[in-house]
């Protein structure tokens, strides 16, 4: 067991916190001490892993205008001083950052103290915080084979580990995809969260209404929808004779994913990781306002492997979706190969790979090489 702790720096959204939690679990199982440095949004992390001490420091997202940028710089500066004092006391073996501005103070402070640094990038486009920190990192772990925003110097220190998923999703690896039968039902899961529920709530019911009745009645819909739109959506599907289950949030989403023949949703890093680990085909509609359009890059990677179809939001019309659904209802044969391609692309052992890489960079052993340890960087 290492007496020096391994510090994880993550905060903000779940997309940054989920992989940190997965790495923490893996490291704890191997007998290592783990500490989390986070912002106010990540303090609930301790509820999931009570063995992990949680330290909150100041941070901020990038503000607009001169005043906003000045406030961000001030908050990050204060956070860096707090992190420097904390790390000087903890003397960690390595600090691992998971992107986003909440990770910046701890990683930047670690580099200044000459503590080994690793960063994990969840998307196919390197985030702005990770770009600023990349040159200070001994190790860059990526989720995609190709990552935009990296140069050759970064590439030499990069390893594809994948993006760890929740245990409930990982368990789906043992549940093979059951392809729909010709002339049988087609079960569709529609997700989207706060940034997707509105567009999917408008387009999907209209597309279903355009289908011939004999095809429409073969559909089963499970769909996330905003609370204020639930009743109207239920009434609309009922009038069409379509079996539909709608809710603002599904606590059993992994189980819903396991049962579906096709998923329609966004292309965030966590969504892509879960789809590919589960081995489920999808129609991906990238969120058009994502920073640096990273969701389009995410979707293209899976589509290029044959595991998904991309519909950019301007092209995600009721008519276009109806045509796609008609084709799959008429001939579902493409779904099984797409599911297999998604599964082949995914890395179900991402937590193990990430732990191996981090421990190797810290000089703590357990750093086993993996077949996918080489990656390419798209400049």
Curated annotation (Swiss-Prot):
**Where UDP-N-acetyl-alpha-D-glucosamine is bound, by residue?**
13-15, 123, 166, 194, 295
Q: One Pfam family this chain carries? A: Glyco_tran_28_C
* The keyword Mitochondrion belongs to this UniProt entry's keyword annotation: no
> Mostly located where?
membrane
Q: Name one GO cellular component term.
A: plasma membrane
Q: What keywords appear on the UniProt entry?
A: Cell cycle, Cell division, Cell inner membrane, Cell membrane, Cell shape, Cell wall biogenesis/degradation, Glycosyltransferase, Membrane, Peptidoglycan synthesis, Transferase
Q: Per its record, what are the GO molecular function terms?
A: UDP-N-acetyl-D-glucosamine:N-acetylmuramoyl-L-alanyl-D-glutamyl-meso-2,6-diaminopimelyl-D-alanyl-D-alanine-diphosphoundecaprenol 4-beta-N-acetylglucosaminlytransferase activity; undecaprenyldiphospho-muramoylpentapeptide beta-N-acetylglucosaminyltransferase activity
Q: Which InterPro entries match?
A: GlcNAc_MurG, Glyco_trans_28_C, GlycoTrans_28_N
Q: In which pathway does it act?
A: Cell wall biogenesis; peptidoglycan biosynthesis
Q: How does it sit in the membrane?
A: Peripheral membrane protein
Q: What is its EC number?
A: 2.4.1.227
Record field: catalytic activity: di-trans,octa-cis-undecaprenyl diphospho-N-acetyl-alpha-D-muramoyl-L-alanyl-D-glutamyl-meso-2,6-diaminopimeloyl-D-alanyl-D-alanine + UDP-N-acetyl-alpha-D-glucosamine = di-trans,octa-cis-undecaprenyl diphospho-[N-acetyl-alpha-D-glucosaminyl-(1->4)]-N-acetyl-alpha-D-muramoyl-L-alanyl-D-glutamyl-meso-2,6-diaminopimeloyl-D-alanyl-D-alanine + UDP + H(+)
- Tell me the compartments it is located in: Cell inner membrane
Q: Which family does it belong to?
A: Belongs to the glycosyltransferase 28 family. MurG subfamily.
Function as written in the Swiss-Prot or TrEMBL entry: Cell wall formation. Catalyzes the transfer of a GlcNAc subunit on undecaprenyl-pyrophosphoryl-MurNAc-pentapeptide (lipid intermediate I) to form undecaprenyl-pyrophosphoryl-MurNAc-(pentapeptide)GlcNAc (lipid intermediate II).
Q: What is the name attached to this protein's record?
A: UDP-N-acetylglucosamine--N-acetylmuramyl-(pentapeptide) pyrophosphoryl-undecaprenol N-acetylglucosamine transferase
Species in which this protein is naturally found: Rhodospirillum centenum (strain ATCC 51521 / SW)
């Amino acid at each position: 067991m290492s007496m020096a702790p391994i510090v994880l720096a993550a905060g903000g959204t779940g997309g940054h916190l989920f992989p940190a939690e997965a790495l923490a679990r893996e490291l704890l199982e191997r007998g290592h001490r783990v500490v989390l440095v986070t912002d106010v949004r990540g303090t609930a992390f301790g509820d999931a892993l009570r063995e992990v001490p949680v330290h909150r420091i100041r941070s901020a997202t990038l503000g607009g205008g001169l005043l906003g940028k000045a406030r961000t710089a001030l908050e990050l500066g204060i956070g860096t001083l707090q992190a420097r004092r904390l790390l000087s006391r903890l003397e960690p073996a390595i600090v691992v950052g998971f992107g986003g501005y909440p990770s910046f103070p701890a990683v930047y402070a670690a580099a200044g103290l000459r503590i080994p640094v690793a960063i994990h990038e969840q998307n196919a486009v390197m985030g702005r915080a990770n770009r600023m920190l990349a040159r200070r990192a001994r190790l860059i772990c990526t989720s995609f084979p190709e990552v935009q925003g990296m140069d050759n110097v970064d590439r030499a220190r990069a390893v594809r580990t994948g993006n760890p998923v929740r245990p409930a999703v990982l368990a789906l690896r043992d549940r093979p995809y059951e392809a729909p039968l010709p002339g049988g039902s087609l079960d569709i899961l529609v997700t989207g969260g706060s940034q997707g529920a509105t567009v999917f709530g408008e387009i999907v019911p209209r597309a279903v209404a355009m289908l011939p009745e004999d095809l429409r009645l073969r559909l089963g819909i499970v769909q996330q929808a905003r609370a204020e739109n639930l009743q109207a959506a239920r009434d609309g599907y009922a009038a069409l004779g379509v079996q539909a289950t709608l809710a603002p949030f599904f606590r059993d989403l992994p189980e819903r994913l396991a049962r579906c023949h096709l998923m329609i949703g966004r292309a965030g890093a966590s969504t892509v990781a879960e789809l590919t680990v589960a081995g489920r085909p999808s129609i991906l509609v990238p969120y058009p306002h994502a920073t640096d359009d990273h969701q389009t890059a995410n979707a293209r990677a899976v589509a290029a492997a044959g595991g998904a179809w991309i519909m950019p939001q301007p092209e995600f019309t009721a008519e276009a979706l109806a045509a796609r659904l008609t084709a799959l209802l008429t001939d579902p044969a493409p779904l099984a190969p797409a599911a297999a391609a998604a599964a082949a692309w995914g890395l179900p052992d991402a937590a193990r790979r990430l732990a191996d890489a981090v421990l190797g960079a810290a000089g703590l052993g357990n750093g086993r090489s993996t077949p996918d340890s080489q990656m390419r960087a798209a400049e």
